[in-house]
């Protein structure tokens, strides 16, 4: 994923090795984004804290699967293959037990056919996400007020 210098798990030592062990996946691998932080391990901790606060906070009112759907949509709009793979996988995990339902959501997002699976507030928020990602300067206070209704 990254073109910057990074330290592999096999070559990690000290604090970085400890963090890699702490944040490893069940299969013993680490996410590529962690490798991108390897030269400055404190940023890896900050990244993880922010990610968990945004997606895993108990105060969230939006379901985790929907937050991952938003992440997937932004990734699609930005044409970031790595991020698409990450959020598609994470969304599937968040929608555990219903792989066909997540597959339909992911397919609709990838085909920009949002109305096929979303409606109401979910669809409105995805419209805002699209505008914020592709043309943030075009957003106005009215854009936000519409979402609050």
Where are the language model's segments positioned?
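Hydrophobic alpha-helical segments
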Residues: 1-149
């Amino acid at each position: 994923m990254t073109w910057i210098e990074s330290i592999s798990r096999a070559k990690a030592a000290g604090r970085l090795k400890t963090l890699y062990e702490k944040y490893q996946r069940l299969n013993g691998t680490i996410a590529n984004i962690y490798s991108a932080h390897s030269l400055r391990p404190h940023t890896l901790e900050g990244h993880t804290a922010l990610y968990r606060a945004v997606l895993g906070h108990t105060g969230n009112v939006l379901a985790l699967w929907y937050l991952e759907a938003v992440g997937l949509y932004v990734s699609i709009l930005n044409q970031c293959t790595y991020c698409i793979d990450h959020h598609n996988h994470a969304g599937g995990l968040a929608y555990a037990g219903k792989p066909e339902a997540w597959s339909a959501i992911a397919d609709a997002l990838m085909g920009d056919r949002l109305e096929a699976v979303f409606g109401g507030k979910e669809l409105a928020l995805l419209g805002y996400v699209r505008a914020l990602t592709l043309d943030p300067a075009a957003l106005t206070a009215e854009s936000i007020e519409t979402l609050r209704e």
